[in-house]
């Protein structure tokens, strides 16, 4: 199951304002915003319903950045197995398995760039 998807935008503030209005009829609102200082990348805004950000926009300055797709893993061992298999298949490391506390205390994810440079993630939200 897809956990969340994220894609680059050319003008972060403009796109954030657009999605705030466009997604409102779907009961989607701004759930989380992550700054560059918090995670070392361009700012990102996560929209969703019921407190779960599953639709992310981010980046600044171009649409040539990779797509980001996160897939739910049943447990942390599965996240680890995904990472190992993806690297063995020719993927490039984009974040080894581990806690990403800037999202929430139990966010355990691993990130791999596919052959085209897209950021593929496996994530588990449950405690160890």
Task: Please give the residue ranges for each predicted region.
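Short glycine-enriched loop/turn motifs at secondary-structure junctions
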Residues: 1, 62-65, 104
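N-terminal beta-strand motif that seeds the catalytic metal site of vicinal oxygen chelate
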Residues: 1-16, 69, 126-128
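Short beta->alpha transition motifs characteristic of CBS
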Residues: 5, 104, 111, 122-128
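Core segments of cupin and vicinal oxygen chelate
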Residues: 7-52
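Vicinal oxygen chelate
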Residues: 11-14, 70-115
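Conserved catalytic-core motifs of GNAT/GCN5-like acyltransferases
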Residues: 29-33, 98-100, 123-128
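Long, continuous compositionally biased terminal/linker segments
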Residues: 38-81
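Glycine-rich acetyl-CoA-binding "A-motif" of GNAT/NAT acetyltransferases
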Residues: 119
């Amino acid at each position: 199951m897809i956990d969340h998807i994220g894609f680059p935008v050319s003008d972060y503030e403009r796109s954030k304002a657009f999605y705030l209005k466009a997604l409102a009829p779907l009961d989607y609102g701004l759930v989380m915003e992550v700054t560059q200082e918090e995670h070392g990348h361009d700012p990102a805004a996560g929209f969703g319903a019921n407190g779960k950000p599953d639709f992310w926009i981010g980046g600044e300055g171009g649409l040539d950045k990779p797509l980001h797709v996160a897939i739910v893993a049943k447990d942390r061992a599965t996240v680890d197995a995904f990472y190992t298999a993806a690297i063995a298949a020719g993927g490039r490391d984009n974040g080894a398995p581990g806690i990403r506390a800037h999202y929430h205390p139990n966010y355990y994810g691993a990130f791999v760039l596919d052959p085209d440079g897209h950021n593929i993630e496996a994530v588990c939200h449950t405690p160890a």
